[in-house]
């Protein structure tokens, strides 16, 4: 049995690297004799870190050979079938599925968020992804959208595989990262996006509120590598307080940091997923529908700190209320988040159960 995994792998995005690690681990547990091949921007690094075969994703002849050699092609996880990033990105991922289906390989849209898609994007998914064997998606909105485009395949709503991620044992050395371990830690994970300047003002105000009223230590975690570090640096300049920018790290250290946090402020979806995984209350920054969908899925009682559909401005009063509430209600929120984490872990396992059914078919 040979699996080919297509996703945003090898770019140094910690959330996607966590996805790859969980998926590979689960495949090994279920199919111990299978061969796993991961399409990657840095195949040497991916092959070393995951102990798999890895094919350079930009070498189309090598990708075609990898598809031809696979029994099952998995597209995911993540938000691959969308053209908010670019039409080129959508064509790449939809093209992998089209090639797999033309080669009569079993194929699966695996644990994805679908959209945003404009008219052209919907046409690409409808025409290029038809014939896909089955699909699992991370939220109800994605299920509804994909069902309208691919009417003849089974589509099940599950949850992100990163809910199954396990941080290695051992406490992280916070002082070595410039963090006072004796003071409550607020971890912030931001990224550039449309509307970032508006979101940044709300986040900076919240950071100052945590620092000045609640005496927290605030640290920015660059989840998406150097691009996120640049976004964090820009945001830190807007703060009156003195938050720190943590060094670029690996997913084990990043998840340990989130697990040790008092509160998380997250634009990055997988930073929020790890916060939920470890029962850490959070303030979401909903730059994309997938962030709003995650909050809705767990019934999170706090509104996002900023939302892509909201007015471009924010009120200091609204931010004050959210910051003070997450701080004062932390224990109750932590218990609620932890309870939902178990449900999301069960849903995350469903991705692999659906895959098992496909393999046996």
Sequence positions of predicted segments:
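Active-site anion-handling motifs in enzyme catalytic cores
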Residues: 1-361
